[in-house]
Amino acid sequence: MKLLLILILIINNYNLCLSYECNSNRTYGLKGSSCEINADCLFPEVCFNSVCSKIRTTGESCTKKTDCTLTYDFGDCVNGKCEIIIATGDRCNPKVTSQKCSSSSECKNGICQLISACNSYNCPLNQYCDDKTKQCKPIPNDINSIVCKANSQCPTSHICTSSNKCIIKYSSKVGEKCTDSPLQCRVFNGEICNQETQKCIKNDQYFKQCEDESTCNGGLCVCLDDVNSKSVCVGPNGELNNEKCVNLEQKLEQCLINEKCNTLSPITCKCFKQFECFQYECNSVERFYNYKSNYYQSLNCSRFLTKP
């Protein structure tokens, strides 16, 4: 479930292009333009010293933490230089001064390893924190043998139910219960969990015009484009109605496992471009937010979206 937490965190941290931000007069600054915040600049430029500039990378000068990070990159400004903060389980190099392991961990044998008790958030991907030993342990391959208390005790492709079992995400059809999580429903099929009946339903408001989320039946109201100032209803976390997104998410999860990524950082994770392409294909905020459209077109996403 760590991947899901990362995705939701990214969505929530974005300055979402919601209906009340839909502005036909909105423009974005090119490199060298004046700015106040990152969203004033055409991606991937960021606002540094009130000027749209390239993102500060490790070892470059900075004045504050946000100079060294995009939403999903764990960076910090230390003594006027950008450092990358590496998650537990990710590869590290103690000789590189511009990188450091996250708190409660240190670089041992080329891997950031915990040196104190674990919690629900600091174990590596597909490991969980054992309540008794307070040590990270691998999630068992036999899903049926798992007795879970939280999503973090299940594989990234599963969620934990109230009956303490791991079930696969998006497995409940229309009319079936979604009492444990909205992600039991097939959100990439335009379906949603009805909060009153706790059953999956087809969202009849999907992609219909909206003023705010009160008319979206539990989904988000997002700006379709800044040109026409039109907003539409989408999934509860911005999901688009695209059946292939489940498969694309599974490919991304497998990439994270293969590459041993524990954070979706553009600096430390080789799956980052694949993640961006997944977001563009499957999330409305990424798809329709004009300040990123040119950047996404340059990524050549077809190599990820058609990869078996």
Swiss-Prot record:
InterPro entries: Diff-Dev_Assoc_Protein
Subcellular location: Secreted
Glycosylation sites: 25, 300
Signal peptide: 1-19
Keywords, in A-Z order: Glycoprotein, Secreted, Signal
Entry's Gene Ontology cellular component terms: extracellular region
Major localization class: secreted
Keyword Protein biosynthesis (UniProt): no
Official protein name in the record: Uncharacterized protein DDB_G0272512
